[in-house]
Curated annotation (Swiss-Prot):
Residues 21-34 have a biased composition (Basic and acidic residues). Residues 1-46 are annotated as: Disordered. Residues 437-776 form the HECT domain. The modification Phosphoserine is found at residue 9. It comes from Pongo abelii (Sumatran orangutan). CDD domains: HECTc. InterPro entries: E3A/B/C-like, HECT_dom, Hect_E3_ubiquitin_ligase. The gene is HECTD2. This is Probable E3 ubiquitin-protein ligase HECTD2.
Length: 776
């Protein structure tokens, strides 16, 4: 059985507003407005050939440019010109980017005469012109004879129509291949034909483009068979579409694919996922480049006016969504999800895109926020921060209005979430303060330690986070269990009457995101998947939260040994009941007491057998990751969402939430060197040169220890090393002393060591024997 591929429909919008319970009523109507999110560049290349002519501005003019007076194939015909319906501005046009269901497909009877095309009978399949071997032999002959006629005739015939494309590239031209499991396309032949195409003379390349135009003109009525889908599948892989001179044709190809019905998209998605990694990545990069160059063309005269091709980007985004869905169906994915990011979007007005997405509901106005997989995590962070800033301003403004209306003097403190805590009662004081000031959680955070002088310019806030996280995650505190094999924390399954401290951890993570603080927390990826299940707080309090579908792979991220044992159970070839002697009852230790739990009613009397072992593994995994910690995680979930009650959260993948909270694990020490500031040193000083020679030569584990020693975390903020504001200060002490770090300020105090050997020795000792909390 295949996995179903569904994309949200405009007719079934997602409810995407998140709010604290007291704010929820007022935002109910806003939630319904949001359009659905579809679940998922390089510069222009040179001309087709050295003799390539000027760029073509429109589809019809391109036809005129590439059509010779007479082709050898005299009985072939094509329309003299193409008339498309009037194109509205992109902000008014129904977005092709959204899922287009059967009812949205244009009815031929209801269409205008401009869009109608004659309904052709079922095609008679042409005879397959060549095999892969025949084609390769023709190409080899060209090298010796220089005669391209055979190759030219092949391209002329193959690309002239959809039936010819199927005849050439189907493994069996007469077979139906009406299955998602196999497109029926000979991928090796397609690759050989396209790899050769760019090395052919220009007239052959123009012949191919003319044939594609003819094919698209005939198929404007919409595909009727799987052979039509196969033709689209083949045409989309054409490397000629890397060139801006072909973008008019490429855009119409994308539009026809984008407007296919859901069932056809389902087939294409499963065919896409069976492409090689190389070919799949080429499709993605080509589409990203197309979007980038339409947004910021190097030569605007290359393209039609935006008002006449406003559908280009929505069409490309929809096809990208199909590829993104295909990528998500493969484990591991064909390419990293970050390869779908379009860095060009970092330079557009993302807040306008966000507000369009938020405010215009189902008015069919296109926004890139409907396709968050193309927006980088750095850009999403900007959206979240600006959205949170706007929320903070609105809350502060309301507080100011309330003060004035009561004839009270305004106080600057009303603009901040002011925390006053004692170091000796850090957890309890923090919990009390956050509980009392729930309405202020979205204000800018400022921390004061009772009995201590000091103005919080960011350092005290970071210190509060570091100390609080350090205490809560300590093994003696009992809230979280550290798993050495996986190097991560997980929720303790102990039962208690009050789970408020788990809520505190959730609030801390939310505050960290909104205040741009990177936390040294090690949760497994499945924690962030649960945190977005659902991504908004349900209006019905009876709906479970933090529950998601989990697998043995998720369990392996936390308890690899147990996951390995369950995998062995699933693959065991003997008699499971006799060899394992297990039942649907499991045991857990809580405060030194062993407790038993039935995975299903009467589980202690149900043996695990070869027939029910999959059910056992699924129930056991679900018990460990969902049911046994439900109350703990629910409190954690509500804490996080009480701060991050924003529609912007809908844009994030679980992996991106982790990066926002904990930072990225990818280190670039050269970037850190370029952005480092100095106090008492110059970057040309000998000690500084020694320092960077040593650090850049460190293995990755020591580089991570250095980062943890100086910043409190071995991860990098979303904005990169530059966002650390790393500083090296001169420590006027004996060179026998070790370096000192002030993690609150990302500062390293370095004595003026006289030799590289001495500096390296002292630095390794310092970073290897300290937890990095040089808090003074």
């Amino acid at each position: 059985m295949s996995e179903a591929v569904r994309v949200p429909s405009p007719a079934t919008p997602l409810v995407v507003a998140a709010a604290a319970p007291e704010e929820r009523k007022g935002k109910e109507s806003e939630r319904e407005k949001l359009p659905p999110i579809v679940s998922a560049g390089a510069g222009a290349t040179a001309g087709l050939d050295r003799g390539a002519k000027g760029q073509i501005s429109t589809f019809s003019s391109f036809i005129s440019a590439v059509s010779p007076k007479k082709e050898a194939a005299e009985n072939r015909s094509s329309p003299a010109h193409l008339v498309f319906p009037n194109i509205k501005n992109v902000r008014d046009q129904p977005p092709i980017c959204l899922d287009v269901r059967q009812k949205q497909r244009t009815s031929m009877d209801a269409s205008s005469s401009e869009m109608k095309a004659p309904v052709l009978p079922e095609p008679i399949h042409p005879i397959q012109p060549k095999t892969v071997k025949d084609f390769q032999e023709d190409v080899e002959k060209v090298k010796s004879s220089g005669d391209w006629k055979a190759v030219h005739d092949f391209y002329l015939t193959t690309f002239d129509s959809f039936p010819e494309l199927n005849a050439a590239f189907k493994k069996d031209a007469t077979a139906s291949f009406n299955t998602i499991e196999d497109s029926g396309i000979n991928a090796k032949f397609v690759n050989a034909v396209y790899d050769t195409l760019l090395n052919t003379p220009q007239d052959i390349q123009k012949t191919v483009l003319k044939g594609i135009i003819n094919s698209l003109l005939r198929e404007w009525k919409g595909p009727r068979t799987k052979d039509d889908l196969r033709a689209y599948f083949v045409l989309l892989q054409n490397p000629q579409f890397n060139n801006t001179s072909t973008y008019v044709i490429y855009a119409h190809l994308l539009r026809q694919i984008a407007t296919l019905v859901e069932a056809d998209h389902h087939f294409l998605v499963h065919w896409f996922k069976r492409l090689s990694q190389k070919r799949f990545k080429q499709l993605v990069e080509r589409l990203l480049q197309f979007i980038s160059l339409r947004l910021f063309p190097a030569k605007p005269e290359e393209f039609p006016p935006v008002t006449k091709c406003s559908w280009w980007i929505p069409s490309a985004a929809k096809v990208l969504a199909l590829l993104n869905t295909a990528n998500n169906l493969v484990h591991p994915p064909l390419i990293p999800y970050t390869d779908f990011y379009n860095s060009t979007l970092d330079h557009i007005d993302l807040m306008e895109e966000y507000h369009t997405w938020q405010n215009f509901g189902n008015s069919h106005r296109f926004s890139f926020c409907q396709y968050p997989f193309v927006i980088s995590v750095a850009a999403k962070k900007i959206i979240i921060q600006r959205d949170s800033e706007q929320q903070m301003i609105n809350i502060a403004r309301q507080s100011l209005v309330d003060k004035v209306s009561r004839r009270q003097r305004p106080d600057m403190n009303m603009l901040f979430l002011n925390m006053k805590v004692r170091r000796t009662h850090l957890v309890s004081d923090s919990l009390d303060e956050l509980t009392r000031k729930r309405a202020d959680l979205k204000k800018k955070l400022k921390v004061t330690f009772v009995g201590e002088a000091g103005l919080d310019m960011g350092g005290l806030t970071k210190e509060w986070f570091l100390l609080l996280i350090r205490q809560i995650f300590h093994p003696d505190y009992g809230m979280f269990t550290y798993h050495k094999d996986s190097h991560c924390h997980w929720f303790s399954s102990f039962k208690c009457d009050n789970y408020s401290e788990f809520r505190l951890v959730g609030i801390l993570m939310g505050l960290a995101v909104y205040n741009s603080i990177t936390l040294d927390i090690r949760f497994p990826p499945c924690c962030y998947k649960k945190l977005l299940s659902p991504p908004i707080i349900p209006s019905d309090q009876n709906i479970p939260v933090g529950i998601c579908s989990v697998t043995v792979d998720d369990l392996c991220q936390i308890m690899p040994e147990l996951a390995h044992g369950l995998s062995e159970l699933l693959s065991h070839e003997g008699n499971v009941e006799e060899d394992f002697y297990s039942t649907f009852q499991v045991f857990q230790e809580e405060f030194g007491i062993i407790k038993s739990y039935n995975l299903k009613p009467g589980g202690d009397k149900i043996s695990v057998t070869n027939q029910n072992r999959k059910e056992y593994v699924q129930l056991y995994t679900d018990f460990l990751l969902n049911k046994s910690i439900y109350k703990q995680f629910a409190a954690f979930y509500y804490g996080f969402h009480s701060v991050c009650a924003s529609n912007a959260l809908m844009l994030l993948r679980p992996e991106e939430v982790e990066i926002l909270v904990c930072g990225s694990p990818d280190l670039d020490m050269h970037a850190l060197q370029r952005s480092t500031q100095y106090d008492g040193y110059a970057k040309t000083d000998l000690t500084i040169k020694y320092f960077w020679d040593v650090v850049l030569g460190f293995p990755l584990d020591l580089q991570k220890k250095l980062l943890h020693f100086t910043t409190g975390s071995d991860r990098v903020p979303v904005g990169g090393m530059a966002d650390l504001n790393f500083k090296i200060s001169k420590n006027e002490t004996s060179t026998n002393c070790l370096p000192v770090a002030h993690t609150c300020f990302n500062q390293l105090c370095l004595p003026p060591y006289k030799s590289k050997k001495d500096l390296k020795q002292k630095l390794i000792i310092g970073i290897s024997n300290s937890e990095g909390f040089g808090l003074e």
